[in-house]
Amino acid sequence: MPGLFAAKKLKKNRQNFKWKDVDYKRKALRLDVKADPLEGAPQARGIVIEKVGIEAKQPNSAIRKCVRVQLIKNGKQLTAFAPGDGAIGFIDEHDEVMIEGIGGPSGRSMGDIPGVRWKVSKVNNVALSEMVSGKIEKPVR
């Protein structure tokens, strides 16, 4: 057992050992925010560069419809999933889209779409889900 007045040393040791924990280190140094294309924001606007089809991982067989987006705030490019049946038809090149996280574990990709961490939520300031359900028509810019 340590001595009666060893609390300061024990506490210091615990603080030093924290830095061996990968999760603590990533959070303390804010590495996730630094590597994040959205720079820690929940959503971001971008311009559609092209439409791409991404093959689903095994055992599924499908082509998931996605778009390449260039962010307005920093010029970084990323791939965003277009959720919904026929949603890709409402998105054209040079449209302004709002993207958000796709909702995978720890901010990562979800399901069978490899390497895609984002999804399109709005196209030209109109909700994509509303257009897919037929409630609203896509505005002409």
UniProtKB/Swiss-Prot annotation:
<dbReference type="InterPro" id="IPR006032">
    <property type="entry name" value="Ribosomal_uS12"/>
</dbReference>
<dbReference type="GO" id="GO:0019843">
    <property type="term" value="F:rRNA binding"/>
</dbReference>
<dbReference type="GO" id="GO:0015935">
    <property type="term" value="C:small ribosomal subunit"/>
</dbReference>
<dbReference type="InterPro" id="IPR012340">
    <property type="entry name" value="NA-bd_OB-fold"/>
</dbReference>
<dbReference type="InterPro" id="IPR022863">
    <property type="entry name" value="Ribosomal_uS12_arc"/>
</dbReference>
<comment type="function">
    <text>With S4 and S5 plays an important role in translational accuracy. Located at the interface of the 30S and 50S subunits.</text>
</comment>
<keyword id="KW-0689">Ribosomal protein</keyword>
<keyword id="KW-0694">RNA-binding</keyword>
<dbReference type="GO" id="GO:0006412">
    <property type="term" value="P:translation"/>
</dbReference>
<dbReference type="InterPro" id="IPR005680">
    <property type="entry name" value="Ribosomal_uS12_euk/arc"/>
</dbReference>
<protein>
    <recommendedName>
        <fullName>Small ribosomal subunit protein uS12</fullName>
    </recommendedName>
</protein>
<keyword id="KW-0699">rRNA-binding</keyword>
<dbReference type="GO" id="GO:0003735">
    <property type="term" value="F:structural constituent of ribosome"/>
</dbReference>
<comment type="similarity">
    <text>Belongs to the universal ribosomal protein uS12 family.</text>
</comment>
<keyword id="KW-0687">Ribonucleoprotein</keyword>
<dbReference type="Pfam" id="PF00164">
    <property type="entry name" value="Ribosom_S12_S23"/>
</dbReference>
<comment type="subunit">
    <text>Part of the 30S ribosomal subunit.</text>
</comment>
